[in-house]
Amino acid sequence: MRNSYVGCCVFAVVMMLMVGVPAVSGAQVAVGITVGFAPPDLPVYEQPICPEEGYIWTPGYWAYDPDFGDYYWVPGTWVLAPEVGFLWTPGYWGWGGSGFVFYEGYWGPRVGFYGGVNYGYGYFGHGYEGGRWDGGHFFYNRSVNNVNVTVIHNVYNTTVINERNTRVSYNGGHGGINERPRPEEEIAARERHTPPVPDQRQHVQAAR
């Protein structure tokens, strides 16, 4: 049996002071769980079709269930942005010196740091190549998104060259991604944010 532990009351500030902790944007904090073993590689999966205009793709990720002592997969899903102009910064797992800590995702006017993890479908480690807001409407990049143009007309097609072939799902630690926040991601960390919306919370619970 794999050795694991769940440590409660883990604060992001404390973890950042420990040796080997990856850089964390100021907007993301640990959710209170430390896990003694790394999450699995990201699986390969197909993106479902976008339901309608205004929905933003939130990629799948590994969550941890302390009751079962193991990770479980939360599928990616389309989520209606809580505000016009808001984009999703995915959460990510990062090495915290004595275990892996999860830094929760958030909504904001620009995409912040998500550990350099290549989640795919526009989230290739930094930023978001899947679409943009323009004039109060969200425009989808068809080269990386599954969009029905008979339903959604705000589309464009820009080829994105993804040179990251790794499916590693965590930052830092043994075998982890060695990436730190870029200047624009540090700026994003200081902007106004909104936590995951109720639909996202329910989606996580349904995946357990």
Where are these regions (language model features)?
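Blade-edge beta-strand/turn elements of extracellular beta-propeller
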Residues: Y71-P75
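Residue-level detector of alpha-helical hydrophobic segments embedded in or interacting with membranes
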Residues: L17, T34-A38, P43-E46, G176-N178, ...
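Classical secretory targeting signals
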Residues: M1-Q28
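Low-complexity, repeat-rich tail regions
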Residues: G20, V79-R208
